[in-house]
C-alpha cells in the first residue's frame, strides 16, 4: 500500500542498513496498522530526540490518510 511504501521510504533513508528493520502493514477497512521492527541500536534514530522523528512521521501519515478517510497507527518495536 502507499502507506507502507511511504513509511519504508522514510525509514530506509533514516537508517544505514535495510537489514536493521522490517515493516509490517495491516489494512482493515478504514484502519491501517503499521509496525516498524527495528534493532536496538537504530531505535533512537527512528524515534528521535523527544520522539520528534516518529511524531513527524505519524503526522505526515495522518495527513496522507485523512484524504482517503483512513486512520493510520504507527508502532515501533525492538526486534
Which stretches of residues belong to each language-model region?
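RNA-contacting regions in translation and RNA-metabolism proteins
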Residues: 1-45, 59-79
Amino acid at each position: 500500500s502507499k502507506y507502507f511504501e511511504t513509511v519504508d521510504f522514510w525509514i530506509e533513508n533514516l537508517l544505514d542498513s535495510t537489514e536493521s528493520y522490517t515493516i509490517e502493514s495491516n489494512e482493515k477497512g478504514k484502519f491501517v496498522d503499521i509496525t516498524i521492527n527495528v534493532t536496538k541500536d537504530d531505535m533512537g534514530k527512528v524515534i528521535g530526540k523527544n520522539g520528534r522523528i516518529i511524531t513527524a512521521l505519524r503526522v505526515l501519515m495522518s495527513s496522507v490518510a485523512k484524504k482517503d478517510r483512513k486512520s493510520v497507527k504507527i508502532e515501533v518495536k525492538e526486534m
